[in-house]
Swiss-Prot record:
GO molecular function: ATP binding; ATP hydrolysis activity; ATP-dependent protein folding chaperone; unfolded protein binding
Entry protein name: T-complex protein 1 subunit alpha
Pfam family membership, one: Cpn60_TCP1
Quaternary data: Heterooligomeric complex of about 850 to 900 kDa that forms two stacked rings, 12 to 16 nm in diameter.
Subcellular location: Cytoplasm
UniProt GO cellular component terms: chaperonin-containing T-complex; cytosol
InterPro entries for this protein: Chap_CCT_alpha, Chaperone_TCP-1, Chaperonin_TCP-1_CS, Cpn60/GroEL/TCP-1, GroEL-like_apical_dom_sf, GROEL-like_equatorial_sf, TCP-1-like_intermed_sf, TCP-1_chaperonin
Keywords: ATP-binding, Chaperone, Cytoplasm, Nucleotide-binding
Gene3D superfamilies: GroEL, GroEL-like equatorial domain, TCP-1-like chaperonin intermediate domain
Length: 557
């Protein structure tokens, strides 16, 4: 196919042909190479410094790619792919990018051998469908058989590559307890785990092992006045997304007064409106008011007199979660549809206790025994802010993984086990097809081996030797029925040997593997379909400015 770079009638250039596809593949590979060395339990971290000097130290694929300022449109597809994996599954962001880039590289080789991209796309789709089916039918194990230990092992596997890998035993138990404490059952009897109801707070100082799990939702706020009660049992909670301040006339309102007494009457009415508003809230039995804005001295006085607790400057995201957990309404204004102010008992949430407690070195507001759904908090300790930020990302990934496993009830063995098994299966499956798709499926099978190879290289082990052993074990498990137990074989990257990873407790959610295969395949196909790139020239901004035009008298009517 000839390569053209021709000017267009519009202000831009058009590139078409093989060079566009090769450029896209090279861009994808360069993104993959950035995150490649951070894969696995012995992967390395990246230090990213942004344009204002903020430093981030992480080996989370999605975070690394989010902080990069990527310009190439094909590379942006991989960045978005990592974000999608992070939102959908929470873990496996690095491996999904590496796999997509490898699929593209091998597809480009086939295109150079004069195989049409449509045949490759068709083959990739067949391979992805067969791979997902094979995982579901042959490579998954139900969690119920393995019990709580399997959940701890899954969290540990997720954390093994992170900065808290040394304390994975401690944190994995904490994460599993936190996830199980926020379990809710819907009317159909299905369990769901809302990990948004787990608030992760960071406080630097002390060691990582002094992090704590607290029953109840912790807020990094304190009561508005020291005269307010610090503990309220059987709390009735109002969640207000506005400030409670003395009512003043709107800007631009002008009042002409001849008599000074009338000015005093206006001030008195302003005070009365504020008092009526506070009494309307307290009249429904509310004794805890959470406000996203400020609370002025006048309002504070009324709350203190009523023996109620007010907490100001609560983050809006926290306020929404508390409203959901306590059954309260998230109120943005007291004004109803008729333009009148109202507040009734149906807008009030309930909790067993709201108290201000000193946890670690900080005063926090703790909301315990929420009525509608449970809530929990994890307070992370670490030597500095970089460490605490990376701990938070690690705990978030582990929580997501545990949630997925608890909801789907299926796990697979980790350490390159799934990829090696699929590689053998798809190679054999490819030979059963008598069409051009056979070549694409064989390349798909070859691409999957990039995960065990990268794991071995990052662990400073002999990748060729280890992957060859792994493939021979999986080949035996698929061809000899008496050796079917070998299907759980994966890599032990510390010892540099092959072992049964199901027994060793290296487990991952089946959903994570299936979704990453689907996402990587779709991303590769999206880039593979492109054979033309039209780039518009940037707008010329060298014209006259508004000030110049005025000075020249060009804008005069």
């Amino acid at each position: 196919m000839s390569t053209l770079a021709s000017p267009l009638s519009i202000a831009g250039t058009r590139q078409s042909g093989a060079s566009v596809r090769t450029q896209n593949v090279m861009a994808a590979l360069s993104i993959s190479n950035i995150v490649k060395s951070s894969l696995g339990p012995v992967g390395l971290d990246k230090m990213l410094v942004d344009d204002i000097g903020d430093v981030t130290v992480t080996n989370d694929g999605a975070t690394i790619l989010r902080l990069l300022e990527v310009e190439h449109p094909a590379a942006k597809v991989l960045v978005e792919l990592a974000q999608l994996q992070d939102e959908e599954v929470g873990d496996g962001t690095t491996s999904v990018v590496i796999l997509a880039a490898e699929l593209l590289k091998n597809a480009d080789e086939l295109v150079k051998q004069k195989i049409h991209p449509t045949s490759i796309i068709s083959g990739y789709r067949i391979a992805c469908k067969e791979a997902c089916k094979y995982i579901s039918e042959h490579l998954t194990a139900p969690v119920d058989e393995l019990g709580r230990d399997s959940l701890i092992n899954i969290a540990k596997t997720s954390m093994s590559s992170k900065i808290i890998g040394a304390d994975a035993e401690f944190f994995s138990a904490m994460v599993v307890d936190a996830a199980q404490s926020v379990k809710i059952t819907d009317p159909r009897g299905q369990a769901a785990y809302s990990i948004k109801a787990i608030n992760v707070l960071k406080a630097h100082g002390k060691s990582a092992r002094e992090s704590v799990l607290i029953p109840g939702y912790a807020l990094n706020c304190t009561i508005a006045s020291q005269q307010m009660p610090k503990k309220i049992v059987n709390a009735k909670i109002a969640c207000l997304d506005f400030s409670l301040q003395k009512t003043k006339m709107k800007m631009g309102v002008q009042v002409l007064i001849n008599d000074p007494d009338k000015l005093e009457a206006i001030r008195a009415r302003e005070l009365d409106i504020t008092k009526e508003r506070i009494n309307m809230i307290l009249g429904t039995g509310v004794n805890v008011v959470l406000v996203s804005g400020g609370v002025d001295d006048l309002c504070m006085k009324y709350f203190v007199e009523a023996g109620a607790m007010a907490v100001r400057r609560v983050k809006k995201s926290d306020l929404k979660i508390i409203a959901k957990a306590t059954g309260a309404a998230f109120i943005t204004s007291l004004t109803n549809m008729d333009g009148e102010e109202s507040f009734d008992a149906s807008m009030v949430g309930e909790a067993a206790e709201v108290a201000q407690e000193r946890i670690c070195d900080d005063e926090l507001i703790l909301i315990k025994g929420t009525k509608a759904r449970a809530a929990a908090s994890i307070i992370l300790r670490g030597p500095n802010d970089f460490y605490c930020d990376e701990m938070e990302r690690s705990v978030h990934d582990a929580l997501c993984v545990v949630k997925r496993v608890l909801e789907s009830k299926k796990v697979v063995a980790g350490g390159g086990c799934v990829e090696a098994a699929l590689s053998i299966y798809l190679e054999n499956f490819a030979t059963s097809l008598a069409s051009r798709e056979q070549l694409a499926i064989a390349e798909f099978a070859k691409s999957l081996l990039v995960i065990p190879k990268t794991l071995s290289v990052n662990a400073a082990k002999d990748a060729t030797d280890l992957v060859a052993k792994l493939r021979s074990y999986h080949n035996s498990s698929q061809t000899k029925p008496e050796r079917s137990d070998l299907k759980w074989t994966g890599l032990d990257l510390i010892e540099g040997v092959v072992r049964d990873n199901k027994k060793a407790g290296v487990l991952e959610p089946a959903m994570s593997k299936i979704k990453s295969l689907k996402f990587a395949t779709e991303a590769a196909i999206t880039i593979l379909r492109i054979d033309d790139m039209i780039k518009l020239n940037p707008e010329d901004k060298s014209g006259k400015s508004y000030a110049d035009a005025c000075a020249a008298g060009e804008l005069d009517g």
